């Protein structure tokens, strides 16, 4: 049996209480109005490409931008919105979702992250992103 570190334990605990989405499910939910929020770094996005229609929000300000009661919220942050977080591989997005859910936001993330998104043949593009720092 492989040793699981503390962060692995935390990750497992963080995923309790919501249903994670496949890339295809996330893409469908985005088309139906959910906010797809990309938390990858600039370097990761330069390597993998940008996700069409995704909002890019740095992990360090994520909660402030998405909390509808925050003075620093983005215009899309409204009560009842659904957020789908996505990162490179689907790990840090789960921790972000736990934090968002803890402040009352309906959030989930994408199993396998952008790597799975690309593997499933979903679109990425090169060029400008919708950054909300």
Protein language model features and the residues they cover:
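Short, surface-exposed ligand- or partner-binding patches at beta-edge/loop junctions that are enriched
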Residues: 85-86
